[in-house]
Structure formats: structure tokens, C-alpha cells
UniProtKB/Swiss-Prot annotation:
Localization, UniProt: Cell inner membrane
Entries under InterPro entries matching the protein: T2SS_GspN_CS, T2SS_protein-GspN
Native organism: Pectobacterium carotovorum subsp. carotovorum (Erwinia carotovora subsp. carotovora)
Biological processes, Gene Ontology terms: protein secretion by the type II secretion system
Top-rank taxon, per record: Bacteria
Any one of the GO CC terms: type II protein secretion system complex
Protein name as catalogued: Type II secretion system protein N
Key words, A-Z: Cell inner membrane, Cell membrane, Membrane, Protein transport, Signal-anchor, Transmembrane, Transmembrane helix, Transport
UniProt topological domain (Periplasmic) ranges: 28-248
UniProt family annotation: Belongs to the GSP N family.
Topology Cytoplasmic: residue spans: 1-6
Cysteines engaged in disulfide bonds, as pairs: none
Amino acid sequence: MKLKSGIVTGVALVLAYGLFLASYAPARLLTAVPLPAGMVVAEAAGTLWQGSLQRFSWRTLTLDDVHWNITFSDFMPALDIAFKNPEGIAGRGIIRGWQRAQFYQWQLSVPAGYLFSHMRFIVPIGAEGNVQLNLQEATVDRSGCQSLDANVTWPGARVKTPLGGLVLATPQATLRCQQGALEANLRQTSSHLQLSGKGSVTPKGEYRFTGQLSSGNDLPATMKKLLATTGKANEQGARTLNFQGRLL
């Protein structure tokens, strides 16, 4: 019995000592250890427990001014992280959990122009405003999204096209998960355009969107003519949209 008690005490002391070392180990160790191909970290400061990086880059992702703090949230180990991006992206939130990663209380702001620059359009299209994600909770595992409580807004949304500017006011989307797939309920109302619908994306990249689109009184005449060729109008003038396919 005494031997078992001594072993438990010894293990506890080793763990405590390990945590002590981790708490005070300098963050610059991150720049000395082997990293995955293409991953770069620069100007590490603080400790492994609470520190910062001047820059983190991997593949096409680049983050500046990254700060982290290892803590506990609801009795789970948690990583509280904040970052910025040279293109104007800013985010902050918590990643926590034991066996499955849970994203908790995340806020992310991305310039709409940055998002549009990574999309494929037949003609040049620009955008104004920032797309904002407010995520209360999300759980993800190998089979896909298991739970999600989030919403996306785009305050002051405007789209620039060769046919003129399109005022979108503040589009809103509610995000949820269903059987591993991401689901979004979208609603947009402005003097130019009204859009409502529901879309989904599966872990395999299969997407589907069904909704209704109608023009507002202030929509430019050239855009109204283009809209008239989209879908079939109902008695109220709204046109039904149905898209499905697979992401590249």
C-alpha cells in the first residue's frame, strides 16, 4: 500500500515539475524545433504557456501579432488565441477539449474584398465592408461538424460590378450543423435586392442552395434586366434559386 502511494506521489511530482517547466519555458523554443514543411514562425516572445509570435505563416496563410494563453475552460484544457493578418483579418477565440476540438466564443472579422479576391467570377467584382463571424460554440471531429452555434453578418455591404454598384445593407446568416454538414440560413433585404434561402455543405464538399431572389425599387435598370433571366418568377415577382454541385 505504501509502495502504491509512493508511486502516485512520484507521478504527481513529475507532472507538477513538467507543468512548472512548461510554464516558464521560453516561447522562442518554437523557432528551434522542427516544423512541418512550409511552416514559419518568427520573433517568439513570452513563454510556451503565455506568449506571442510576430509572424506565423503556413502555405497560403499568414498571421501577424499572434498571442496565446494556455488555460482551462469548463474543466477542459484551453488555448485562448488572438491574431491579425496583413490583409486586415482579425480574430480571437478559444480552442478547448480533451478528445474533440471545440471552438468557443470566437469573433472573426474579414474584409469582404479579401474574400471576393479568392473567388472565381466571370467578370471583375469587388466588395466593401467587413464580414463578421460570431461563434458561440462549435465541435468538430474526423466525421465533420458535430455542433455549431454561430452567425455571420456583413454590415454596410456593397458589391462593385461592371453594371454598377449593388447595395446589400446587412446580409445575415445563421450557421448550424446537421449530420456532419454545415447549414446556413441566409436573409438579405435592401432597396436593391431581397434574398432569402438555405444552403448546406457536406464534409465531402457537396453543396446545395435553395432560395428566393427579388429586386428592389432602387436596383439599377441594367441589373433588373439581368435578374429577369435568373430562375422563374412567382406571383410576387420573386425568383426561385436552386444550386447544387461539388466544391473544387
